[in-house]
UniProtKB/Swiss-Prot annotation:
The gene is dapA. This is 4-hydroxy-tetrahydrodipicolinate synthase. Its EC number is 4.3.3.7. Pfam families: DHDPS (PF00701). It comes from Methanococcus aeolicus (strain ATCC BAA-1280 / DSM 17508 / OCM 812 / Nankai-3). InterPro entries: Aldolase_TIM (IPR013785), DapA (IPR005263), DapA-like (IPR002220), Schiff_base-form_aldolases_CS (IPR020624). It is an enzyme of class 4 (lyase). It comes from the Archaea. Catalyzes the condensation of (S)-aspartate-beta-semialdehyde [(S)-ASA] and pyruvate to 4-hydroxy-tetrahydrodipicolinate (HTPA).
């Protein structure tokens, strides 16, 4: 797996999912050259979606993409049985792969993680993207565990690494041939320079073309050209994480008149000071 895969937001309208807005956002990304989308992930506010909404969003994403780009469906859970059910649903409706976050809150051991992902891998045939984000889950998927899973299961092909420690990421890349996608926009270029393959991105929701260009340059070894875009994007990327994701990206999309709508509690509107910083970054980039 290689390239740019925006983690799409879930637009809301009148308390429900705005499916027309969702389609509009996906088509915008397809038209701007992304390699695929990630549906109902962290950026899509998956924790506050009902199971029915979760499934309908995946179905809509598959329908809109229609084979033009890949759909990576969020299917993770801190319950192995629930993750299996969500993964099987995603496969049944035509998703190209599933994104599986490490179980959160219950803090499994590395052996528990091996057994969790093994059970899911044995239950489906489509590719699996492991998702390591210790800042949210309180558990780190160790390089040795990733290596074991990659070598044991042919459908575990990729890991989204949102651990910002480049030493950890280097160990992962050096341990096996699993595809590594950065889970941090700001670290995309460094991760590719270490041997990574791309990114699951937040900023690409609003500047997909530029981000795709940067990643393409990097994957072609044109790091001078990639660096120029990286630094052009840098302040904008940082501004999208001054509060919890997806609060800033949805705020930015609303400011840019893109379908986004409200946030679902417990997420709420940005503090005015931070919103001003975000608006400034959007203006400096030329989006406002």
């Amino acid at each position: 797996m290689q390239g740019v895969f925006p983690a799409i937001i879930t637009p809301f309208k009148n308390g429900g999912v705005d499916y027309e807005g969702l389609e509009q956002n996906i088509n915008f990304l397809i038209d701007n050259g992304v390699n695929g989308i990630v549906s109902v992930g962290t950026t899509g506010e998956s924790p506050t979606l009902s199971h029915d909404e979760h499934k309908k969003i995946i179905e809509k994403s598959v329908s809109v993409c229609d084979g033009k780009v890949d759909v990576i469906a969020g299917a993770g859970s801190n319950s192995t049985e629930e993750a299996i059910a969500l993964s099987q649903f995603a496969e049944d409706v035509g998703a190209d792969s599933v994104l599986l976050i490490t179980p959160y809150y219950n803090k499994p051991t590395q052996e528990g993680l091996k057994q969790h992902f093994s059970k899911i891998a044995e239950s489906i045939n489509i590719p699996i993207v492991l998702y390591n984000v210790p800042s949210r889950t309180a558990v780190n998927l160790q390089p040795e565990t990733i290596k074991y899973l990659y070598e044991e299961y042919s459908n575990i092909t990729t890991v989204k690494e949102a651990n910002p420690d480049l030493s950890h990421i280097s160990d992962v890349i050096n341990s096996c041939d699993i595809s590594v996608l950065s889970g941090n926009d700001e670290l995309t270029l460094p991760v590719i320079s270490l041997g990574g393959n791309g990114v699951i991105s937040v900023v690409a929701n609003i500047v997909p073309n530029e981000f795709v260009q940067m990643v393409n340059y990097a994957n072609e070894g044109k790091f001078k050209e990639a660096r120029e875009i990286h630094y052009k994007l840098f302040n904008l990327m940082k501004s999208l994480f001054i509060e919890t994701n997806p609060v800033p990206i949805k705020t930015a999309m609303n400011l840019l008149n893109m379908p986004a709508g409200d946030l679902r509690l417990p997420l709420c509107k940005m503090e005015e000071e931070n919103k001003f910083k975000l608006e400034t970054a959007l203006k400096e980039y030329g989006l406002l």
